[in-house]
Amino acid sequence: MKPGITVLLMAGGFAIASVLAVPLARAADVFILSSPAIQDNGTLAIKNACSDKQRSPNCVGENVSPPLAWSNPPDGTKSFALLLFDPEGRAPAGVSHMVVYGIPADVKGFAEGELSKPSDKFVGGKSLMGLGVYTGPGTPPNTDWHHYTWTIIATDLDPKALQPGLTRDELAKALEGHVKGSAGLVTRFRHPT
């Protein structure tokens, strides 16, 4: 071998050995939001779409919230907030489909449909539709996919610290200095016609 290649291979081996010696974060330590029904970037079912045809003719579903679960929240977490946002809806502002918070730290998820109605497990905020519970997608016909960003936020606030009815922006302001970490999941939906 030429000396240049030998030196290069030795340097490469040293670099690999150095990288392998660095402790890596275990996946088990990462704060994760998931759904047993939908993979990240997966599609929401028709039943997850909004159902109030009087409010929007684009509603084609049953307004059943998908099941969600989270694991490995940061140390010191006292409560969670959970948001659902569609950045493509009503462009350029986007649509806030759900704002809930005050979720106790011992809650690790919600069953299918559980976020579609008031619960002792969360404080209802105010979505764009003025509701404190889940409102599913209502995309117009003949439009491209919309992306629905689910965000779980770990906070150091007591579950009863915030008043009901906060909008997404009001919640963001109230959480300043109290966020321990967050995790997200993206789902997609488009009108079936």
Residue ranges of predicted features:
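Bacterial N-terminal signal peptides
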Residues: L8-A21
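N-terminus-centered regions that define maturation/targeting leaders and the start
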Residues: L24-T193
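Positively charged n-region of N-terminal signal peptides that target proteins for export
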Residues: M1-I5
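Short hydrophobic/aromatic-rich motifs at helix boundaries and adjacent loops
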Residues: T6-V7, W145
